[in-house]
């Protein structure tokens, strides 16, 4: 009986040991599952990180290219601006050169021709020059005798007492004024009428 008991005890010990081994095995299996899940998550995060790094590199490359394009654009526009300032008057000057030629021809004939022919040549040259200026948007400021004085377009050089013109009107134009595309290029220099003292 003792032997039976002893065998039963041994059998119970073996059962407990076997159960312990089974529990450890199950626990080991659970740790293996967790380890596999963690490794899977790490691989997923590494893949996402690689994708984000590639996207960041592509964005950086795009930024660098666009920055270079912007710098090239700035340099090109600066060069164009300098060229425009340097040669912007080229077509105007090409149109003025024939006027210079006409004046030189008129001066060349001044000795050999009558005064009336020289005056006619000067009139023609003056007309050519005004036509060229008009082509480029330059027109004379209205400033004839009797025109109402306008300080936006006229510069009063002096006041003249006159009875035949209303006060604050142009008496005489000393130098014509000009507009460039409706913006004042230079004012007309004029004398302005005032009421005579003896009439006041």
Curated annotation (Swiss-Prot):
Locations listed in the record: Cytoplasm
Signal peptide positions on this chain: none
Record key words, sorted: Chaperone, Cytoplasm, Stress response
Entry GO terms, CC: cytosol
Top-rank lineage group of the source organism: Bacteria
Main location class: cytoplasm
GO molecular function, one term: unfolded protein binding
InterPro entries hit by this protein: GrpE, GrpE_coiled_coil, GrpE_head
GO biological-process terms attached to the record: protein folding
Entry keyword annotation includes Phosphoprotein: no
Role of this protein: Participates actively in the response to hyperosmotic and heat shock by preventing the aggregation of stress-denatured proteins, in association with DnaK and GrpE. It is the nucleotide exchange factor for DnaK and may function as a thermosensor. Unfolded proteins bind initially to DnaJ; upon interaction with the DnaJ-bound protein, DnaK hydrolyzes its bound ATP, resulting in the formation of a stable complex. GrpE releases ADP from DnaK; ATP binding to DnaK triggers the release of the substrate protein, thus completing the reaction cycle.
Subunit structure: Homodimer.
Family that this chain belongs to: Belongs to the GrpE family.
PANTHER family: GRPE PROTEIN (PTHR21237), GRPE PROTEIN HOMOLOG, MITOCHONDRIAL (PTHR21237:SF23)
Protein name: Protein GrpE
Organism: Geobacter sulfurreducens (strain ATCC 51573 / DSM 12127 / PCA)
Encoding gene, per UniProt annotation: grpE
């Amino acid at each position: 009986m003792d032997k039976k008991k002893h065998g039963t005890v041994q059998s119970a010990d073996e059962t407990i040991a076997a159960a312990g081994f089974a529990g450890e095995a199950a626990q080991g299996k659970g740790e293996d599952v967790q380890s596999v899940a963690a490794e899977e998550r790490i691989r997923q995060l590494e893949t996402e990180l690689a994708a984000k790094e590639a996207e960041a590199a592509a964005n950086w490359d795009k930024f660098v290219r666009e920055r270079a394009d912007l710098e090239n654009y700035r340099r090109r526009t600066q060069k164009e601006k300098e060229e425009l300032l340097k040669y912007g008057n080229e077509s105007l000057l090409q149109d003025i050169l024939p006027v210079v030629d006409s004046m030189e021809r008129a001066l060349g004939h001044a000795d050999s021709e009558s005064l009336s022919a020289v005056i006619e040549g000067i009139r023609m040259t003056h007309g050519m020059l005004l036509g060229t200026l008009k082509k480029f948007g330059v027109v004379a400021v209205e400033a004839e005798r009797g025109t109402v004085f306008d300080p936006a377009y006229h510069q009063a050089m002096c006041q003249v007492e006159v009875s035949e013109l209303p006060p604050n009107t142009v008496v005489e134009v000393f130098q014509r004024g000009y507009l460039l595309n409706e913006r004042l290029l230079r004012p007309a220099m004029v004398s302005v009428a005032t009421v005579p003292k003896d009439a006041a």
